[in-house]
Amino acid sequence: MEVKIEQSWKNALAGEFEKPYFASLVRFLHNEKASGKKIFPPGSQIFRAFDLTPLDQVKVVILGQDPYHGPGQAHGLSFSVPDNIPAPPSLKNIFKEIESDLGVRMSGYPNLEKWARQGVLLLNAVLTVRSGEAASHSKIGWEEFTDAVIRYVSDNCEGVVFMLWGNFARSKRDLIDRQRHYVLEAAHPSPLARGAFFGCRHFSRANDILSSIGRQPVDWQL
């Protein structure tokens, strides 16, 4: 199956695109559109995380659950929204933690493309959603695909820092070879977690790890 995705990922994931579950997933999305359902993000942005962070550049993975389901919010990067959209509550809490952890001022600019271009794979486990219906595209095949992505990174890259926030993301830890990679776990940054995310210091810890293995730290300031 021909999938429009960055070439290094296309090569790495070619086997997934030929599996029955992926054909079923594509059929489901076509049927959603044919029946007039509004799907986020727009089709050209579904694989945006991969387009901005080629496989050989991955040094951090931040795993989200599914895209924002409000108009104009989702643009293919976990936790991120486009420039003209107010930062959602979880992203505001991420920025607060960065300010506390790194002693920098965050502008509140909500588009995380700068991170993606530095090797931070902003991966949602589910890559599409129906407008206004959270988790409406869970269990249609995306989880199988993104589990394969995590497994591929684990098996074929070295020294990647995985940030797993909340129980859903943490459930993916067994896909990761912790002899080769670094797994940082914390509560979810959502306000529903009652502040348990604060103090995790994942951003300084990730940079310390990257520096210690000779990789360029991430400039987290926006």
Regions found by a protein language model. Give the residues of each.
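Generic N-terminal amphipathic, Lys/Arg-enriched alpha-helix
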Residues: 1-13
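A polyanion-binding, active-site-adjacent surface
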Residues: 15-164, 168-171, 176-185, 189-194, ...
